[in-house]
Amino acid sequence: MGILGLSKLIADLAPQAIRESEMKHFFGRKVAIDASMCLYQFLIAVRSEGAQLATVNGDPTSHLMGMFYRTIRLLDNGIKPVYVFDGKPPDLKSGELAKRAERREEAEKALKAATDAGDDAEIEKFNRRLVRVTKEHAREAKELLSLMGVPYVDAPCEAEAQCAALVKAGKVYATATEDMDALTFGSTKLLRYLTYSEARKMPVKEFSYDKLLEGLEVNNREFIDLCILLGCDYCESIKGIGPKRAIELINNYRDIETILDNLDTSKYTVPENWNYKVARELFIEPEVADASAIDLKWTEPDEEGLVKFLCGDRQFSEERVRNGAKKLLKSKHAQTQVRLDSFFKTLPSTPNAVHAAKRKAEEAKKSANNKKAKTSGGAARGRRPK
């Protein structure tokens, strides 16, 4: 689910935090990619196009085709991807997972009804809703990435949290996912639509964490409370409070505790036994592997290994796989070029960096105004300025 309404709220109140760019703009960047989100996109895309990509036994291979060719495209554009896979979901997510299971059951019933009625459009719609990424999909994707020479990380818990940890440690430039909660976990940069197909012609949308905090006039802790009010995967939200009201409450009271002390409960319904404090701590201190100890290496592809893995039972074209392997090798050798900013050391981000910078800017502005006032006073007493 991510964070409900956050993208639009940022677009409305902190548009300076969003920049749209072509993929080539990120040449030379290392990017942590939410692997499960990617695999889901690939499975959904193939269904919507009506294609049937499968092994001789009928097992789907669309996730492998998507991973193979989309990764090649990223590398062709000078981007060095590292894929991050989900671990076990946190206990707090059990409520959201239960809701998803209920929606799945409803979709299965609706699919049966659509099938009985012979409604192709409805059949397609509910088939898409039943798509999910399995452990086998993830296992095969990891094997493919190893053969391609592309690194991956197994997160102990949420992939978005691990991606954010890699960004904060300076290991990668940004998190690439469609889930906005990567920002709630503190990723200083979030890229949306990076792994979309070229045919969709969607520019990459880059969100800056520091700029959105400044635009929304909140610090990192207040931003987390805002996201909980908007609606996250880890607890319920207060009924009746939408994005506009949520940011007003945070700007007025600064935290959920004070909001609850001043909330009109006849107008808004607070969930019983609301776990917002535990959800807050999960965002502040998520379960992640030590990012500073993770060694990311991009190696040469194993062409013969790729042919053996993708061709045969999986029915990929050997010619296309070999051409893909050659592109991988070419892109690896071409990536000796570096971005100019890579010559300067990137320090791991700190949550309050934006506020320190803001204070510094305000002090500089105040100092400049004082100097201007003195200069103006001098001009009044001396020669009339031309």
Curated annotation (Swiss-Prot):
Give the main EC class: hydrolase
* Compartments, as annotated in UniProt: Nucleus, Nucleolus; Nucleus, Nucleoplasm; Mitochondrion
User: Major location, coarse class?
Assistant: nucleus
Q: Which GO terms of type biological process are on file? A: base-excision repair; DNA replication, removal of RNA primer
Task: Tell me the residue numbers annotated for binding DNA.
Answer: 47, 70, 158, 231, 233
Region annotated Interaction with PCNA sits at 336-344
Residues the entry annotates as binding Mg(2+) 1: 34, 86, 158, 160
Q: Does the keyword Membrane apply?
A: no
UniProt keyword GTP-binding present: no
Return the cofactor note field.
Binds 2 magnesium ions per subunit. They probably participate in the reaction catalyzed by the enzyme. May bind an additional third magnesium ion after substrate binding.
Provide the residue positions that the database annotates as binding Mg(2+) 2.
179, 181, 233
Cofactor(s) essential for the protein: Mg(2+)
- Gene Ontology cellular component? mitochondrion; nucleolus; nucleoplasm
A Pfam family found in this protein is XPG_N
A molecular function (GO) held by this record is: RNA-DNA hybrid ribonuclease activity
Q: Which family does it belong to?
A: Belongs to the XPG/RAD2 endonuclease family. FEN1 subfamily.
**Its biological function?**
Structure-specific nuclease with 5'-flap endonuclease and 5'-3' exonuclease activities involved in DNA replication and repair. During DNA replication, cleaves the 5'-overhanging flap structure that is generated by displacement synthesis when DNA polymerase encounters the 5'-end of a downstream Okazaki fragment. It enters the flap from the 5'-end and then tracks to cleave the flap base, leaving a nick for ligation. Also involved in the long patch base excision repair (LP-BER) pathway, by cleaving within the apurinic/apyrimidinic (AP) site-terminated flap.
Protein's name according to its UniProt entry: Flap endonuclease 1
